[in-house]
Amino acid sequence: MIPVILLPGKLTTNSQGVRGDSFSTGRRYSEAVARAGGVVVQAQPIAQTTAAAHELVARFDGVIIQGGGDIDPNRYGQKPRSNAIYGISLEHDELEIAVIRAAIELDKPVLAICRGIQILNVALGGTLHQHLADVLADGESHWDKHHEINLEPNSRVAKAMKTVAPKQSHSFHHQAIDKLAPGLVVTGLAPDQTIEAVELNAKKWIVGVQWHPEDDADTEPDQQNLFNGFVDAIAR
C-alpha cells in the first residue's frame, strides 16, 4: 500500500485560472514524498475540516506541516511586537494545531517544516522569537540562506538523513523557537544556536526542522533522506 500523507493547505489569492481565492500546498513537498514512495493529500483550512481533524488524521498514514506565514502571537500568550510579522491566518493556525494534536494522540508520524516546527512547538505549549533580528547579531542569517546545521548523532533526524551535518540546508525564516514546549527535545542547532530540529521522543516519529529540506531534496541526498526516513517510519 502506498503511504498517504495529510498536508494542511493554506489560503492563496493568486492562483492562475481559479476564480476567487484557493488553497495550496507546496509542490516540492509532494515531489519529495513521491520520491520516497508516498503521496500527499491536502486538507483545506476551513472550520469544517478543523472540527473533523481527529477523524481526518485517523484516515491517513502520516502528516506533513509545511512552511508559510507567521503564527498569531496570541497563540503563545504574547501580543505582536514586531513589524516584521506577516501572513497571519487564524484558520491556518487552527487547522494545523488541531491536526498536530490529533496526530500525536493517534501516534502518527509527523514531519513539521519551517513554520511547521514553530507551530508544533506552539501547539504543545512553547513560544517563539517573533523576529530573529531582535535577538541575533546577524538578524538576516536565516533569511534565504544556506548554512550549517549540527544534529545530535542518535536523533531520529540524524538517523533519517544519515549524517550529523547535512549539506545544503536552506533557511528562509525570521522567527524561531524561543521557549521549548514540554516533551520536545532539541536535536539540531545552527552555529548561532538557533534551534533547527526538535523531536517528541514519547511518540513514534514526531520530527520538526526549521530549514526547508524540500528545496534541495531533488539534488541533495541528505535532504531527500529526511523524507525517506519519514515515509519509512510509517511502515514500522
Label every model-predicted segment:
Residues 117:
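The feature captures the ABC ATPase H-loop/switch
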Residues 172:
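DNA-recognition element of transcription regulators
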